[in-house]
Amino acid sequence: MSLEVRGIEVWRGRGRTLGPMDLTLEPGEVLAVVGPNGAGKSTLLSAMSGELRCSTGEVLLDGTPLLQWKPRERAMRLGVLPQESSLGFGFTALEVALLGRSPHSSRAEGSADLAAAVAALDATDTRHLASRSYLTLSGGERQRVQLSRVLAQLSEPLASGHRYLLLDEPTASLDLAHQHLVLEAAARFAQAGGAVLAVLHDLNLAARYAHRMAVLAEGRVVELGAPAQVLSQELVARVFGLRVQVVEWPGSPGPLVIPEGRAPLTP
């Protein structure tokens, strides 16, 4: 059981923006997807979520092609936090979190839905915002409330199959403390048997929280493995154009990347 991409390619016009690519997201892991701007990270996430149709290949959710799942059944298994979430109505933060319970409730929300939404707000440090209008929140607060919605959506273990959480730059608008809080919530989701794919730009956050890292460049996976195996001075210089030191740090679960400056261009 996994969320798997097999031989996918995405073409736009005459240009290929992603692939060919094979990648598997396993239950119990946090998989960080890193790479420079334009490498195809968000395109990959869109393909894995079903938002973007692949030109070739397929995406399998627990062994079944993603597009063959009924929307409600798929939503109970697969949750997505996009880079930006627009909402034009003055819902409270609690009401936004409750939106994630829609696949589980055919009628009005019950006590179990409310409990799941409140627990999700607790996980993202937004419970104190529960009665606030979403439209009055800061960008970082909105992002955390939207994560609460997705956590509430995936809060219930399934009788069969697994739960998959796809996060597109979940730390982009957050302060330092909340960056770690959000990734700690993702790690707990994985520890509970879920699977997390997170698109990240911060290599140190990726190294700290991810079990595996997929490094993308020009629409392809160029390295895949544990952070300690993947991150090297040579790789960061080649893929990101940056000179760094990669060191072990006492107490850190992954290596530490220390920037030194832009790497010289290589032919």
From Swiss-Prot:
Cellular component terms per the entry's GO annotation? plasma membrane
Its taxonomic path starts at: Bacteria, Pseudomonadati, Myxococcota, Myxococcia, Myxococcales
The molecule here is called: Hemin import ATP-binding protein HmuV
Species of origin reads Myxococcus xanthus (strain DK1622)
Q: What is its EC number?
A: 7.6.2.-
What functional role does this protein have? Part of the ABC transporter complex HmuTUV involved in hemin import. Responsible for energy coupling to the transport system.
Q: Give the gene name.
A: hmuV
Superkingdom of the source?
Bacteria
The protein's UniProt keywords, in alphabetical order, are: ATP-binding, Cell inner membrane, Cell membrane, Membrane, Nucleotide-binding, Translocase, Transport
Assembly notes: The complex is composed of two ATP-binding proteins (HmuV), two transmembrane proteins (HmuU) and a solute-binding protein (HmuT).
